[in-house]
Every structure is written in structure tokens, then in C-alpha cells.
Amino acid sequence: MSRRGVIQRRPVPSDSVYNSRLVSMIIRRIMRHGKKSLAARIVYEALKTIEERTGNGALETFERAVRNATPLVEVKARRVGGATYQVPMEVRSERGTTLALRWLVQYSRSRPGRTMASKLANELMDAANETGNAIRKREETHRMAEANKAFAHYRY
């Protein structure tokens, strides 16, 4: 058994504008090459666009988008006697949120459009309305878990 201690996860500080951990997390996810101020500008611009287009609170729409894109189950590869099985596992809330943000940013980047802020705004609005590629990815993940339900007893 390992003698190393368990690493404590550092809490993510809230962002200064919306005072939200989720906004801070998506800023970090969008950031490339250490350019955090650019990432923050993109996120705040996207949230401003959402507020202008929907009329609702931008933070509320963003939180709904993340909640809709969060998976409940996923499959993990487990090797048993020479065969690799896709074993369905429940997703912890922290990992679910991380996956949702990762998918939202990934599919925002792959969208057609001019600016990253507009692409992110469109993806977030789609996710809030239960459409979009991030939601499709969550549904696909759930389908994979459902299809491999027979291997659930290999859970570890």
C-alpha cells in the first residue's frame, strides 16, 4: 500500500465580476498559454451577449447550461482476464461539472463563427435549452453506460 498521503484539492476562488466558482472554472478552462485576462474577457463578453439576447440573468442561464450538460454516469475501461470491458460508473458531482465545462468549451471552439465569445454564448444558450453538441455528448455518454449495464458488477 502506498505511503503517500492524499492530496487535498485546492478550492477554486470565485471570480470578481459574478462572484461565482463556475465562471472562474470556465475562465480557467478557456485560458490558453497563461492568458487569463483574455479568457476572462471572452467569458464576460459571452455572458453579456447571453443577457442581451435572452433577457434573463446571464449567470442563471450559464448555470442551467452547465447543469444540463453534466453527465450522471460514464463508462470506464476495466481489464478482466484479457478482455477490456466498458464498465458504467456514477460520476461524482465535481467530475460531472468538470466534464460539462470541458465539453461546453470543446464544442464552442469547434463551432463556426467569428469570435470565441459569440461561439461560447451560442453553445451555452443551446445547452440551456437542452440542445447543442455538449448535450449530445452527455446523451451519448448515458447511452454508452446504458448499453454496458451488463458489466456494472465489475465496478471498482
Swiss-Prot record:
Protein function: One of the primary rRNA binding proteins, it binds directly to 16S rRNA where it nucleates assembly of the head domain of the 30S subunit. Is located at the subunit interface close to the decoding center, probably blocks exit of the E-site tRNA.
Q: Which residues cross the membrane?
A: none
Q: Which organism is it from?
A: Nostoc punctiforme (strain ATCC 29133 / PCC 73102)
Q: What is this protein called?
A: Small ribosomal subunit protein uS7
Q: Which PROSITE patterns does the entry link to?
A: RIBOSOMAL_S7
* Lineage, top ranks: Bacteria, Bacillati, Cyanobacteriota, Cyanophyceae, Nostocales
| UniProt-listed CDD domains | uS7_Chloroplast (cd14871)
Q: Which GO terms describe its molecular function?
A: rRNA binding; structural constituent of ribosome; tRNA binding
- What GO terms in the biological process aspect are recorded for it? translation
What quaternary structure, including any partners, is listed in this protein's UniProt entry? Part of the 30S ribosomal subunit. Contacts proteins S9 and S11.
Write down a Pfam family by its short name.
Ribosomal_S7
GO CC, alphabetical: small ribosomal subunit
Which PANTHER family does this chain map to? RIBOSOMAL PROTEIN S7 (PTHR11205)
Q: Which cysteines are joined by disulfide bonds?
A: none
Task: Kindly state which keywords UniProt assigns to this record, in alphabetical order.
Answer: Ribonucleoprotein, Ribosomal protein, RNA-binding, rRNA-binding, tRNA-binding
Q: Which family does it belong to?
A: Belongs to the universal ribosomal protein uS7 family.
This protein's encoding gene: rpsG
NCBIfam families given in the database record: rpsG_bact
Q: Note the superkingdom of the native organism.
A: Bacteria
